[in-house]
Amino acid sequence: GKDQYARLDKISVALPHPDAAAAIIKGGTEITGHFGNPPFQEQELADNPNARIVLKSYDVQGGPGSATVLYATEKFRTESPRTYTAFVNALADAAEFIAAQPEQAADIYLKLTGAKTSRQLLLSVIRNPEVQFNITPQNTLGLGQFMHEVGAIKNRPQVLADYFFDDPRVASGS
């Protein structure tokens, strides 16, 4: 909650997800917890019998949350509209492809990343109803408002347009 939001900061370190997952899977390191995202959190649970779920962002945020948000400046968007549009369209196409072709999406992911993740585990992540692939923001406004309440950001967001560009695909988000 608001009064305890920074309580774990003094015992937290920032690590790339693959490194944190490797530490949890291996066990016996100073890394004993990981605020992860797919597929790393699923790998930890599958490969370390002592790993447990402590909390889920799905429960904390009251539903799905945007696991990844990409940033661009207004200057970039204005000066490079074709590049910006092509990039956002490619993200939307990828999200639609993953939802429509999960098996092929898993194969592409494994081939391009060289990840040692099991195909079956990856498919279970893609098909998990709590994991959604789309470009519509999900439960970001409440998080932004909480961040303002605790002083982590200066301006309190009122609407998505306070921090997302105007785009019909964003308008229905939260």
Segments (PLM) and residue ranges:
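Short, polar/charged alpha-helical segment
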Residues: 1, 44, 139-145, 158
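Conserved C-terminal helix/tail region of periplasmic/extracytoplasmic solute-binding proteins
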Residues: 147-174
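Secondary-structure end/capping motifs
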Residues: 78-154
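Residue-level "edge-of-site" marker
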Residues: 57, 123, 160-161
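A local structural motif
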Residues: 1-16, 27-31, 117-119, 153-160
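Short, solvent-exposed polar/charged micro-motifs at secondary-structure junctions
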Residues: 21-23, 65, 130-133, 166-171
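Pocket-lining segment of extracytoplasmic ligand-binding domains
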Residues: 10-13, 18-110
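Short secondary-structure boundary/hinge segments and terminal tails
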Residues: 44, 62-63, 127-128, 164-166
